[in-house]
Amino acid sequence: KSPPQALNKPLPAPSAPSL
């Protein structure tokens, strides 16, 4: 089982810019 990308590369959602 490969590690989730969320833990490997925590990037903000480009689809929904909260900022």
Curated annotation (Swiss-Prot):
One GO MF term = toxin activity
Q: Where in the cell is it found?
A: Secreted
Keyword Secreted applies? yes
Q: Which UniProt keywords apply?
A: Glycoprotein, Secreted, Toxin
Main localization is: secreted
Q: In which tissues is it expressed?
A: Expressed by the venom duct.
Q: Where do glycans attach?
A: 15
Name used for this protein in its record: Pro-rich toxin 4
